[in-house]
């Protein structure tokens, strides 16, 4: 089973940030949630919840 989460960035920013700590079991549910929740000038990306992505986006202190 794969799990997913949503990250976002302002269109003028370079790096994505964690949007919410909600985990989804279906990629399309994560994308739908992100689209409904985002402001206009933001981009979203749905990522697989794995060790690499967790370390990159969830551990804000390490960035």
Model region roles, listed by residue range:
Residues 1-20:
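Short aromatic-glycine-(Arg/Gly/Cys) micro-motifs in beta-strand/loop hairpins
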Residues 8-9, 25, 48:
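Intrinsic disorder/low-complexity segments, especially N-terminal tails and targeting/processing regions
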Residues 15-28, 37, 43:
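A short, exposed loop/beta-hairpin motif centered on an aromatic-Gly-Thr core
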Residues 31-63:
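Short, mixed-charge low-complexity intrinsically disordered segments
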């Amino acid at each position: 089973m794969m799990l997913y989460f949503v990250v976002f960035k302002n269109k003028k920013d370079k790096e994505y940030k964690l949007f919410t700590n909600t985990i989804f079991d279906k990629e399309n549910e994560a994308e739908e949630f992100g689209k409904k929740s985002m402001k206009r000038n933001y981009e979203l990306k749905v990522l697989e919840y794995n060790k690499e992505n967790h370390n990159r986006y969830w551990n804000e202190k390490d960035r």
